[in-house]
């Protein structure tokens, strides 16, 4: 998958298949403890993802100062298209490879040959289409004169979708370190390309580079940097391709597609739900002439919310093997319920940590983007609900009713569409933010209700509600104190004394939240240990 600086949520990896005899984790494979091996590999796979998110966040100050709001909006729109098209072009064959490569009597080489040939053919045919009609596509999107950017997107998709199968093969063979190394090199290449383009090229404009990017910083820099990283990634896979044994099996391919295409269809609502609002800005935003600016401002606010997403991603890496490992334990359900409470409390700490110091966080982004700072707490709460949704959704994974996930996601997608279509023409990016919040809330409620029916877990909704009440009280006290005691005091524009006192009070409120969490969760840690025995 792409690791661009514009955040794109990753497709979640499935449970890895039974490992082969070789082990590239640096030691002899421990067949007696596959879950320990899985957890170790998950941690390695997660390093590149977490690194991408961190670099992603670190580049926000540069992007929001070196790009206009409109240019940043264009990048956001393009990345939304890429995210959706990736799911379509891979056809779900990543997962299909895992399933068929482990079937008795099936040659894994034939499985990956079929998948690689199919995805390569489709994605590079799509690239050819983008090249042939780049002018028409650019004009239709309102980017006449930027045909090269359309071609870059086609190249990104072709290379990224093809290497997705090769990455799947590395996972199948448990070559976790090689997987992480290639991903990391790709991320660092993109970082270096961005540094060169934004900080060196504008003062060293030349005819050669002028064929690929604009002479002054704009969205072409970001897209071209991603393309360069995809090319480097493809080059690193050349040794694998040289050793690759191509065995095409038409019958096997048909079986793989019958299995994989429904998975692709099932994944589409989820990815569309995450990125639909970015696409709708073009058609529904309040100011039709400045919709790109609105989208850029919204995306900057989303970027400041990435700290919540980073924690959730790290939690997911650890939580899935944790949940599955204990699924058969007597006290498993009680343990899951307690985990949910601690997860909620920590997410609340992150939310308040940003909300109470929102003035400080606003200094990260450029002045032109700060009109969207009010959206940040809404997006933080949205992502918090998304993380809680992951927790309550374990029921259909543990009970085998994974088909329910499609309907839950479709319900969330419907809410996203309704909220944005009705409110975006009037409220612009505020509608997009509340669309996320409403969508994740509905999905959370539906999943929790169905989970109580099919796989009941004794969640303490009183404690969880108490935590949310505590978060709400702290937020209200913060806003009340700012209005009554520190009116007009903003970090960076007021006296040092008033700024210091304001930060001191907010720190006290954050400590009060921590103390409140200790009261709400009193005794639950011991109960978790008891449930583990």
Q: Would you name each region that the model predicts?
A:
Residues 2-57, 106-113, 144, 250-266, ...:
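N-terminal membrane topogenesis motif
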Residues 33-94, 122-134, 154-156, 190-191, ...:
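Signature of the first transmembrane helix
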